[in-house]
From Swiss-Prot:
One of its GO terms (biological process) is phytochromobilin biosynthetic process. Its EC number is 1.3.7.5. PANTHER family: PHYTOCHROMOBILIN:FERREDOXIN OXIDOREDUCTASE, CHLOROPLASTIC. It comes from Trichodesmium erythraeum (strain IMS101). The gene is pcyA. This is Phycocyanobilin:ferredoxin oxidoreductase. Catalyzes the four-electron reduction of biliverdin IX-alpha (2-electron reduction at both the A and D rings); the reaction proceeds via an isolatable 2-electron intermediate, 181,182-dihydrobiliverdin. It catalyses: (2R,3Z)-phycocyanobilin + 4 oxidized [2Fe-2S]-[ferredoxin] = biliverdin IXalpha + 4 reduced [2Fe-2S]-[ferredoxin] + 4 H(+). GO terms for molecular function: cobalt ion binding; phycocyanobilin:ferredoxin oxidoreductase activity. InterPro entries: Ferredoxin-dep_bilin_Rdtase, Ferredoxin_bilin_OxRdtase.
Amino acid sequence: MLKTSIPSQGIQQNPLVCQLANSIEAVWQRYLNLEPYYLPADLGYVEGRLEGEKLIIQNKCYQTAQFRKLHLELATIGPKLDILHCVMFPRISYPLPIFGTDLVGARGQISAAVVDISPQSQDRKLPEVYNYQLQALPIKEFAHPRQLPQWGEIFSEFCLFIRPTGLEEEQKFISIVESYLEIHCQQAIAQKPVSPEQQLEILKAQHHYCTQQRQNDKTRRVLEKAFGPEWTDYYLTTVLFDSPN
C-alpha cells in the first residue's frame, strides 16, 4: 500500500485545514489500496503571486481499482487565505457518485466548509444505501448554512455548505466529512463493474459534473489573477476537473 502524508513543503495552514487533510488521507489508507497518480511535473507544486502575496498550490493525487483519481489540493495566499479541495473521481466502470469537500479559511477563521456525495445517475438521485446512511447524520445542526451557487444542481440533498462558528461546529464538520468518506469508501469496495452501456451513462454524468464545477467564477478569478487565463484553463481541465476519456 502506498504511504502518504500531507501537508509538506511550503504549506503552513489553518489547523482545521491540516486536520481535515490528515483525516481524509487516514480514511483513504484504511479502506483503499492507493497507487500513485502522476500529474504533469509542473503541477504538483506551484507558486505564484496574487496582489503582492505569495500563492502556493500543492496537489497530491492517487488512484485505486475503483477511482481513476483521488485529488487533494492545499493552497495558501500569504497569511490571508487557506484552501483545501478534495474530489474522488470514480472510474467509469463503477456506478459510484462523486465525493467532494472544500474548506476556505480567511485570516484564521473558516469562512466556508462544504461536503457532498454528488449523484451521477440519470434521475439525479443517490443510491438508496447512501440515503439510508446519510440521513442519520446531523447535517442540519449548524447555525450558519450557506446558499449553494447557481450551478449547484449537481449536488445532492445531503450537501452540507456552512460557515462553522466555533470549535464545536468545526469538529462536527470534520466528523461528518469522515462519515461521508467512510460510507463512500465502503460502498466503493463493494461495487462490481458495470456494462459498457452503463459506462457511457457514467461518462456523460462525469462530463456534466466537471463542466458545472468549472463554472466556479471565484476559483477562476483567483487563478487568472495569479497565473493568467491560459494556465488557468490548463489547470482546471488537467488537475481540478478533468473529464474522463
